[in-house]
Each structure stands twice: as structure tokens, then as C-alpha cells.
Amino acid sequence: MEIFDSLIKEVSELMEPYSKTEYSFEKENSWEDVGHNQVILQKETKIELDGVGFNLLTSSNIDDSIVVVGKDLQELKENSKFARICFIEFCEAEDIQKTYNLIRKIEYTKYHFFPDGYMIRTSSKAHKESVRVSKTAVKNGVDFHKIGNLLISKFKENPAVKGVKVVFVTEAAVDFSKLENLSRKNHEITETLNQVMNNLTFDCDTCNLKAICDEVEGMRELHFKSSRVK
């Protein structure tokens, strides 16, 4: 599947000018998952991160890794803008319906991810992801490497997931508005997949999906395939 590849390229290019720290995936060095939602009160909070979080799926090769662009959790002294982007290699299903269902299932992984002292709040409608990190977690050595290890482990519980690169961004110089736009576009592409499965319009000029098909490589081919147009 190539429909998200242009977004992966844009994110990578946006991060290119900034210094990065890259870690290999070490499952045994994962932060503890407490298995349930936590409430971290303001008085218990050391750092608040506010920004976006989204996943970009591809059939291209992705090596398991964690990349930190900017300061890590142990280095942050004040609240920060934030982004969490995952590049995910997966084996797409044999038809569009099953592939869409698989994408949604992979997306739902974030609702089963509960790092100790790391409270995640998401808004799918607003494409937002914010985090509260507790004083205790910081004291106990939490960092993005350990959080990323846990997240990759969660994704790879799904046998269709073959590789995951997690990118955490706190660098203040990054254009977070562009990341927000890419997150929004990612959501639009995913929702368009759902529409494609139910849209049997054969005329590109009158189809309400034309704008997305024109912009996203591979989307028109999926639409025609779904419509059984040769």
C-alpha cells in the first residue's frame, strides 16, 4: 500500500534539518504498562506535552526503531509542544474492506497502551494527542526510548505489523502546524478509504472523491479496483 507514502516522505523531510537521537528497539527495555487508564493530577505532573499523534502505514520496509527529535523526557524542564508519529510496515489484506479494517485495528492500539506515569489524552476529531508525565515517572527514569519500546511491542502484537519506527518530537523549532496538517490529511485519507468501498461512481469528473484521488498516489487505483473497473 502506497497511499500514505507521500506523508511519510513529508514528515521525514520536515525532520531532516534537526538533530536526532536514534535507538534500536529493545523489547526487554520497555517501560511498564499498567494495563488501565491513569489519572495524573496537575500537582503530580512534572511535564505536559501538547501536540499531535498519528500513524502512517506502508508496505515498504520499516526497521524497528525509536527516534527523538529534540529533548528527551529527562531533559525537559518545562512544558513542550509535542508530536508522536509512527511509520508502520504492515501486510495489507487481500481486499480493500479487510485492509481498511486492519488499518483501523492497528490504529486502535493506542487505546490499549498505558505506560506507568504517562497519561495520554487523544482527540481523533481534532487530531490531537497530549501527555502528562508524572514526577514519579521522571524520577524513576522514564524516557522516550522506553516508551517507544513499549509502543512498538504493542503494535507488534498484531501479526500483520512487521516493522515500526516511532518518532517523538519536542524540538521547538519544528513547524508543528505542518505536522498538524499532515495528521489531518492522514485522517482524511483513511476516511476516504471507507468511502471508496461504498462509492461506485465510475466518472472521475463527477466523483466527490476526485480531490483526494488527484492528490494521493494509489488512491484512484484503489477506487477503480473497489468499483471493479478494469
Language-model segments: what does each one mean?
Residues 1, 6-19, 24-26, 119-146:
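Signals and flexible motifs at protein termini associated with secretion
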Residues 1-64:
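Charged, amphipathic alpha-helical stretches
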Residues 227-230:
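Long, charge-rich boundary regions
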